[in-house]
């Protein structure tokens, strides 16, 4: 159906312009993806306790459209929280590779971001970004649940921005 706006009454035209949304398919997909994130939890230390708090009734991450999944094949966001050891690194990479595209990674806490207090240990990876590409870093030791929700919202903004501009904002 084609609408000729010149033939419409001014009130009808104003009503149509107010109620019709014009966008591209890429922007619509970006909006849908950003509002239905399914994170996979990968809790390795203290930050995992704070991550569990996000799913509790006080913070309730579900109301933002994010539902925790236990399988990498059902999730599109990996939240790595805690110290990643060199022995654990291949497992983190394998889980990342099992996730369907598009996929994103959040590094939660000082240990996942840069090795934390164990950075000088021979067995600790100095940041999960040496194993998988990280999209959002959440600092803190441990960061509180509100910081994780803020990080997830930043990831949503990033997804919508990439869909709108077509530019990648990651180190992939």
Swiss-Prot record:
Its EC number is 7.1.1.-. It is a peripheral membrane protein. It is found in: Cell membrane. Binds 1 [4Fe-4S] cluster. It holds the Pfam family Oxidored_q6. InterPro entries: NADH_UbQ_OxRdtase-like_20kDa, NADH_UQ_OxRdtase_20Kd_su. It catalyses: a quinone + NADH + 5 H(+)(in) = a quinol + NAD(+) + 4 H(+)(out). GO terms for cellular component: plasma membrane; respiratory chain complex I. Belongs to the complex I 20 kDa subunit family. This is NADH-quinone oxidoreductase subunit B. The lineage of its organism: Bacteria, Bacillati, Bacillota, Bacilli, Bacillales.
């Amino acid at each position: 159906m084609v609408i000729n706006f010149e033939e419409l009454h001014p009130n009808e035209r104003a009503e149509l312009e107010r109620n019709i949304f014009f966008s591209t398919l890429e922007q619509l997909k970006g909006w849908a993806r950003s509002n239905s994130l399914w994170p996979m939890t990968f809790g390795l230390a203290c930050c995992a306790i704070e991550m569990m708090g996000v799913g509790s009734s006080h913070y309730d991450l579900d109301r933002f459209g994010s539902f925790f999944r236990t399988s990498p094949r059902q999730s599109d966001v990996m939240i790595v929280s805690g110290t990643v050891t060199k022995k654990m690194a291949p497992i983190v990479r394998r889980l990342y590779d099992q996730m369907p595209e598009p996929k994103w990674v959040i590094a939660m806490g000082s240990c996942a971001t840069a090795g934390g207090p164990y950075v000088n240990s021979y067995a600790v990876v100095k940041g999960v970004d040496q194993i998988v590409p990280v999209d959002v870093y959440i600092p803190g030791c441990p960061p509180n649940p509100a910081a994780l929700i803020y990080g997830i919202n930043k990831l949503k903004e990033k997804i919508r921005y990439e869909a709108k501009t077509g530019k990648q904002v990651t180190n992939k």
